[in-house]
């Protein structure tokens, strides 16, 4: 089996909304204000007001991602995207979440399990 990337994805994030400590860790809502994706078979934008991460940082400092978004392809199809995963919450991530820095590609690691759904026959 040969794995090939479907796309590269970027998101413009709002400052997190702190929900606070709960039984699973420190929960926050990180809203996505646009972004995009591009690859050999899929390209387009992230619909504004349709995406967020319900992030939890546990007592070990591991971030647990729960992201949902609506993608709009370059040819007008809508795709629901959801992924769960884990995020290494290092100094770069902490600074970005605090609004005092950026975390660029390659400055942390995260592992996700994506799922996508659409009713558009071109992308089933």
Where are the regions that the model predicts?
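Beta-strand-enriched cores of mature, soluble protein domains
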Residues: 1-124
């Amino acid at each position: 089996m040969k794995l090939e990337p479907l796309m590269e994805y970027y998101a413009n994030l709002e400052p997190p909304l702190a929900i606070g400590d709960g039984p699973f860790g420190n929960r926050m809502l990180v809203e996505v204000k646009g972004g995009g994706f591009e690859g050999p078979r899929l390209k387009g934008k992230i619909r504004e007001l349709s995406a967020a991460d319900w992030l939890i940082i546990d007592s070990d400092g591991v971030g647990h991602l729960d992201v949902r978004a609506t993608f709009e392809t370059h040819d007008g199809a809508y795709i629901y995207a959801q992924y769960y995963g884990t995020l290494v919450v290092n100094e770069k991530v902490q600074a970005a979440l605090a609004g005092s820095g950026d975390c660029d590609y390659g400055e942390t690691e995260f592992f996700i399990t994506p799922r996508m759904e659409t009713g558009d026959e071109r992308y089933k």
